[in-house]
C-alpha cells in the first residue's frame, strides 16, 4: 500500500500542473455591477439606509439629482425623472433613516445609479455630491419588481 501512494501523488501533481487554468471572467462581474441599478422587469425599488445625522446631506444630494434629471436634454433621463418617486419612512428606526426610491415604470436597460447619474448630469459638482452621499449612506438595497395586477 505504501508503494502505491507516492506514484498516485506524483500523477496527481503532474496532472494538476498541466491542467488548464480556469479563471473567473471579469466581464460578467463587470456587467452585473454595471446593471446593478437597472430594472429589466419594468419596475423597481432602491432602499437607502441613511445615517440619522446626515439626512440633510442625503436630501440635498437627492434634490440636486432630481433637478439635474428634470433639466436633462436626453429623453431617457427625462423619462427616468418622470417615473422616479422618492419617499422617506416616517417610522423611527434606531440606526437609519430609510428612503425608498420607486421606479414605475422603469426605463428598460437604463441605469438608475445615482452616482453615475450625478457624474453624467452635473460633472463639475459630482465629486462633492458623491462625497456627501457616501458619508450619509449606511447601505443600499435593490429590488426588482414584477407586476401582479
Protein language model features and the residues they cover:
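Positively charged n-region of N-terminal signal peptides that target proteins for export
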Residues: 1-4
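Generic signature of intrinsically disordered, low-complexity segments enriched in small/polar residues
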Residues: 7, 40, 61, 90, ...
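Bacterial N-terminal signal peptides
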Residues: 7-17
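Sec/Tat signal peptide C-region and signal peptidase I cleavage site
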Residues: 18-24
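An amphipathic, aromatic/His-enriched active-site/gating alpha helix that lines ligand/cofactor pockets
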Residues: 25-28, 67-83, 94-96, 102-149
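N-terminal secretory signal peptides
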Residues: 26-83, 87-89, 142-145
Amino acid at each position: 500500500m505504501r508503494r502505491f501512494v507516492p506514484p498516485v501523488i506524483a500523477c496527481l501533481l503532474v496532472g494538476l500542473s498541466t491542467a488548464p487554468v480556469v479563471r473567473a471572467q471579469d466581464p460578467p462581474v463587470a456587467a452585473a455591477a454595471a446593471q446593478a441599478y437597472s430594472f429589466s422587469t419594468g419596475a423597481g425599488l432602491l432602499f437607502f439606509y441613511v445615517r440619522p445625522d446626515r439626512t440633510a446631506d442625503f436630501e440635498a444630494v437627492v434634490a440636486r439629482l432630481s433637478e439635474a434629471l428634470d433639466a436633462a436634454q436626453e429623453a431617457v433621463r427625462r423619462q427616468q425623472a418622470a417615473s422616479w418617486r422618492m419617499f422617506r419612512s416616517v417610522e423611527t428606526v434606531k440606526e437609519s433613516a430609510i428612503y425608498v426610491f420607486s421606479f414605475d415604470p422603469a426605463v428598460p436597460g437604463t441605469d438608475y445609479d445615482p452616482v453615475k447619474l450625478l457624474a453624467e448630469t452635473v460633472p463639475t459638482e459630482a465629486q462633492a455630491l458623491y462625497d456627501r452621499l457616501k458619508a450619509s449612506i449606511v447601505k443600499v438595497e435593490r429590488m426588482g419588481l414584477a407586476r401582479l395586477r
